[in-house]
């Protein structure tokens, strides 16, 4: 929705000029692809690019039932998968992670170096016992879970960028007021450490 909204909003246009005009930087590229062709699409882009990239992010469907997802995942360097405390979603996430891990153990030559889970949309009203119970299960299965927990919040569901602070945007960083309490900065820092980007 962003390009259409920017065309209608002088404030966002000015912000865009301020962010990219003065620095000479460009917005990062977003490529559309299918899970089957994701890695090849990125490879072709990187070959033609004049820039060197430290990091390429892939946003894949959250189920291995979509054609190409499993093959794409095992050909990544690292996978970070969100988990929620909702029972059916948790079962699906656990099946996904365990299937990937089993494949990694049987095929040592795959590029995938690690799969890490992180808590997403954590509702503070949910019992700590549930969270602690799942954490114990993950430990017993030796499944890595990031320390950072992303809380459940309305700001993830919609964006008030037309009138209020930006949060969900591919062109602008989240405003400091919208970032407060989101833990996204902590998540990014933890991922940077795992990927040795710092």
Regions found by a protein language model. Give the residues of each.
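C-terminal boundary of histidine-terminating zinc-finger modules
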Residues: 158-185
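Inter-motif core of Ras-like GTPase G domains
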Residues: 67-87
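Conserved C-terminal guanine-recognition region of P-loop GTPase G domains, centered on the G4
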Residues: 93-109
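Beta-strand-loop-alpha "switch" segments that mediate conformational coupling across diverse proteins
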Residues: 121-168
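Structural beta-sheet core signal
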Residues: 58, 81, 117-119
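Catalytic P-loop NTPase motifs of RecA-like helicase/translocase cores
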Residues: 7-8, 63-65, 87-89, 103, ...
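P-loop/Walker-type NTP enzyme "switch/lid" segment
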Residues: 1-57, 62, 161
